[in-house]
């Protein structure tokens, strides 16, 4: 552009256009490189206009800030990986297209990390944009989610979905988000009369086509528009969500199965990302344990059809429920359709409105998975109805609750385990509250440990052999001086205080024993049972009342052949243990008492030594001697053998049952030798052989298997006097060495 100056006044050339005209002309002709026009005028009004244009090669400059930055590819193709060149996410990549290798362009194989050497190659899938899942045949037209979107936008979305059919498109996963992404969805679905209400039906995009929701809204004409809009929305979503992933629907490695974005988890491969995603899915979706707080009540997700009546929506426009009817709130509806909705269990709009906006990220992406992808265990979890009043956020709605008429039908808990369905289990029954102050009021006298030790000593001498009794006595003698030294200065009040501390400790252990599923038993230092869990009773058959001395102890199983054999064949020689031991039955109360029902009249609990076999009892007292005064908070982990609770009738029924089922003895004798484990109870062909203690072996004295007239003489063991009358012979295995009495 040129300008001439004559007589101090500027006179532009008539043929040359002005600066504005030339700028507009250059913008229309070359829009890619618009000129920069600068005009300078002096004080006399004269000036020159200069224009400069950037060269075309400027955009190719590497240091140009306007140069488009290349995104780093998730994984390079095989050709670019070998050539150590930059690749792209598209397949085939641009470099392979230029070289004519588009048919052979595929993702390269990375070197496995050390912690992935044992992982299969199928688990190490390519990146989120790899072509592992080909959706070219399963891609469907994605419906327009914005009500005011133009046709060009919808065509652009459809072209984008078709062009990226070979990749895992985020559009397909977007439909599974419970949280809405645009405020225009609310205005598109809501009827005009409900603009002031807080119901957002757009969250029905998260419902799966397999979930059929029945809305009975015909009674209210104002909600008919809502029901029609919901049906249209559900039908459009059903066509969209029906088998959205084609053949990869049941593939556990597919990321959409757990509805989370692997690319946002910053993992180098899918193996680690899927592992953490599955753990999160199990922690949030599989349990579905309803918390106690009604403000955050989630409950279990119902998978079957639910019934929504018009009463829950209100009978007028001023009585609309301010709740969301999406996946988070359908959890508390009865899946069997037997109960109506409880509005106290549903989220309010004020509490969730801050999370539903499009400016916030999609939190809890794993928990908002579609209903058909959820764990089947959530369908069987018990439903829970709370009666907690509304929170402060629903204060404006509490004045209209009298018009809603919710029907709170009591719902029974459903148990998914087949073995527990036939048992009368009371789910959710709270433990009766008991104040610890009752312990200090009830304990008035100390516990008689002296009588307990005397009873323990008498029991050990009767049951065990002298050799085993000596081993137990040595263990107790090692702690006897220390025990006497610590208790000789205690007076009556100290002993009462010690018993209160013991009962207070049992009160604390009660919750622990009930909460823990491990068989647990607590005993005093005398070995008397003080507390027992129900799992221990189930395991051994010992009732809690029997162990605590509240019922008679009729056990005959002592871990040796003395218990069951002689008591069955010779019933006249059987004497209940409670009549000739430290326990005797009170004829008035039927309870076992100490000292044959003496003056004390104290009920006698079962000793721990009665529950164990001989070797386990010796090992217990040896460990007890080490921990009694050496380490007050020590513990020993060991193994032991427990004896099941068996009465005389149980042993007789067991013996007769085995005798009837087994036929054909040796040399024509009926019945064979049987060994029952509970513990060592041995019965022979036609007679019984009894022993007491591990070192006592009794049998016939060198009976000849070939001589049927040989009879076994009576034998006695070193631990007790056991009488054995052999009417036949012991056949099959020869004879054991006999100890004559």
UniProtKB/Swiss-Prot annotation:
Keyword match Transcription: yes
Subcellular location: Nucleus
Segments for region (Disordered): 1-70, 135-163, 202-239, 285-321, 401-421, 559-590, 655-741
CDD domains: GAL4
Gene3D superfamilies: Zn(2)-C6 fungal-type DNA-binding domain
InterPro entries cross-referenced by the UniProt entry: ERT1_acuK_gluconeogen_tf, PAS_13, Zn2-C6_fun-type_DNA-bd_sf, Zn2Cys6_DnaBD
Keyword Zinc: yes
Signal sequence bounds: none
Gene Ontology BP terms: cellular response to starvation; gluconeogenesis
Compositional bias segments (type: Basic residues): 723-732
GO MF annotation, one: RNA polymerase II transcription regulatory region sequence-specific DNA binding
Alphabetized UniProt keyword annotations: Activator, DNA-binding, Gluconeogenesis, Metal-binding, Nucleus, Transcription, Transcription regulation, Zinc
Function: Transcription factor which regulates nonfermentable carbon utilization. Activator of gluconeogenetic genes.
Family: Belongs to the ERT1/acuK family.
Protein name listed in UniProt: Transcription activator of gluconeogenesis BDBG_05438
Species per Swiss-Prot/TrEMBL record: Blastomyces gilchristii (strain SLH14081) (Blastomyces dermatitidis)
């Amino acid at each position: 552009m040129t300008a001439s100056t004559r007589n101090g006044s500027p006179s532009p050339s008539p043929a040359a256009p002005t600066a504005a005209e030339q700028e507009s002309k250059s913008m229309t002709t070359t829009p890619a490189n618009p000129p920069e026009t600068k005009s300078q005028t002096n004080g006399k009004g004269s000036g020159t206009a200069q224009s400069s244009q950037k060269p075309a090669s400027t955009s190719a400059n590497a240091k140009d800030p306007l140069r488009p930055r290349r995104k780093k590819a998730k994984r390079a193709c095989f050709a670019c990986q070998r050539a150590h060149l930059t690749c792209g996410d598209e397949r085939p990549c641009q470099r392979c297209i230029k070289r004519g290798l588009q048919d052979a362009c595929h993702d390269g194989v990375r070197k496995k990390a050390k912690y992935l050497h044992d992982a299969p190659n199928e688990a190490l899938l390519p990146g989120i944009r790899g072509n592992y899942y080909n959706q070219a045949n399963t891609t469907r037209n994605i419906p327009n989610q914005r009500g005011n979107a133009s046709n060009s936008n919808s065509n652009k979305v459809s072209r984008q979905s078709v062009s990226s059919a070979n990749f895992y498109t985020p559009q397909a996963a977007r439909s599974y988000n419970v949280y809405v992404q645009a405020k225009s969805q609310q205005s598109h679905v809501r009827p005009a009369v409900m603009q002031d209400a807080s119901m957002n039906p757009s969250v029905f995009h998260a419902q799966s086509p397999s979930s059929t929701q029945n809305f009975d809204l015909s009674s209210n004409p104002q909600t008919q528009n809502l029901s029609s809009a919901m049906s249209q929305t559900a039908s459009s979503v059903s066509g969209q969500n029906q088998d959205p992933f084609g053949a990869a629907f049941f593939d556990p490695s597919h990321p959409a199965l757990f509805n989370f974005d692997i690319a946002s988890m910053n993992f180098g491969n899918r193996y680690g990302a899927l592992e953490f995603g599955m753990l999160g899915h199990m922690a949030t979706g599989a349990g579905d344990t309803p918390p106690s707080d009604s403000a955050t009540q989630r409950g279990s997700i119902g998978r079957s059809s639910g019934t929504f009546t018009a009463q829950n929506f209100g009978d007028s426009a001023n009585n609309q429920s301010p709740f969301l009817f999406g996946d988070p709130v359908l959890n508390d509806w009865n899946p069997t359709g037997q109960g109506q909705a409880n509005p106290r269990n549903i989220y309010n709009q004020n509490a969730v409105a801050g999370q539903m906006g499009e400016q916030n990220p999609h939190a809890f992406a794993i928990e908002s998975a579609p209903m058909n992808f959820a764990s089947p265990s959530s369908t069987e979890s018990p439903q829970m109805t709370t009666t907690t009043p509304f929170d402060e956020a629903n204060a404006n709605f509490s004045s209209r609750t009298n018009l809603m008429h919710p029907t709170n039908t009591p719902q029974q808990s459903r148990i998914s385990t087949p073995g527990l369905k036939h048992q009368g289990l009371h789910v959710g029954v709270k433990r009766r509250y008991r104040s610890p102050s009752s312990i200090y009021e009830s304990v008035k006298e100390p516990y008689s440990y002296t009588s307990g030790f005397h009873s323990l000593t008498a029991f050990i001498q009767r049951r065990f052999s002298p050799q085993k009794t000596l081993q137990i006595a040595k263990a107790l003698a090692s702690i006897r001086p220390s025990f006497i030294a610590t208790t000789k200065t205690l007076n009556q009040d100290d002993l009462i205080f010690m018993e209160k501390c013991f009962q207070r400790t049992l009160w604390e252990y009660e919750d622990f024993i009930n909460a823990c599923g491990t068989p647990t038993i607590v005993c005093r230092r005398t070995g008397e049972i003080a507390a027992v869990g129900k799992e221990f009773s189930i395991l051994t058959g010992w009732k809690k009342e029997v162990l605590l001395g509240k019922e008679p102890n009729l056990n005959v199983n002592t871990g040796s052949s003395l218990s069951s054999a002689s008591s069955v064949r010779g019933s006249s020689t059987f004497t209940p243990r409670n009549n000739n031991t430290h326990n005797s039955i009170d004829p008035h109360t039927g309870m076992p008492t100490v000292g044959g029902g003496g003056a004390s009249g104290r009920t006698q609990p079962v000793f721990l030594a009665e529950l164990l076999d001989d070797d386990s009892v010796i090992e217990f007292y040896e460990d007890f001697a080490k921990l009694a005064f050496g380490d007050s908070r020590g513990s020993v982990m060991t193994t032991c053998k427990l004896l099941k609770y068996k009465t005389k009738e149980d042993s007789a029924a067991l013996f007769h049952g085995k005798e009837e089922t087994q036929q054909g003895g040796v040399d024509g004798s009926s019945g064979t030798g049987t060994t029952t484990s509970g513990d060592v109870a041995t019965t022979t062909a036609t007679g019984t052989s009894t022993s007491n203690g591990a070192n006592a072996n009794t049998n016939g004295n060198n009976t000849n298997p070939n001589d049927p007239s040989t009879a076994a003489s009576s034998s006695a063991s070193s631990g007790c006097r056991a009488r054995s009358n052999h009417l036949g012979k012991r056949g099959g295995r020869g004879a054991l060495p006999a100890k004559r009495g």
